[in-house]
């Protein structure tokens, strides 16, 4: 007879397959369209099997966020100065989250639970290398998160997507160049 733990698992079901299916659903339907029931149906398993791996939707979204965060790569000298490097990382974050409707807003609404020290460092390290204090760099990251979440919440009218994307990029640039200018006048 198998031990109870062995009976609890559906063959082939693991956290990564659950996260992958959740990402597919979010890409199609947004965060609001994701449910544990739909996820279980998509995976072809009983609802209880999914819950044995992931206890609730919020934990699932934390795992999804971690998967998305892992896609962000650090900038290097080929991306320009330190402010350009921070911008490069922020634009990656934006683009990754944009493919999954509702994730940026969910993350912004739950910042303490969804904060990523790794992502924060990808932006703050270049800013601190440029001479900003840790507090200033942290404030800039928070401002960029708010800008990103706000941009993701707005339903851009058809035909204005490129203009909205350009405005977002310009906003990131304005925030970072403003910080650069301020740091040079101390």
Language-model region placement:
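C-terminal peripheral helix-coil segments that are non-catalytic and often amphipathic
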Residues: 1-5, 160-186
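Basic, helix-initiating cap at the start of DNA-binding domains
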Residues: 1-42, 54-62
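Residues in the recognition helix of alpha-helical DNA-binding motifs
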Residues: 53-54, 140
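Hydrophobic alpha-helical bundle segments that form small-molecule/ligand-binding pockets
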Residues: 119-161, 179-183
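Hydrophobic alpha-helical connector segments
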Residues: 73-109, 115, 134, 141-144
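Key DNA-contact positions within bacterial/archaeal DNA-binding proteins
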Residues: 37, 46-49
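Short, basic, alpha-helical segments at the C-terminal edge of helix-turn-helix-like DNA-binding modules
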Residues: 66-71
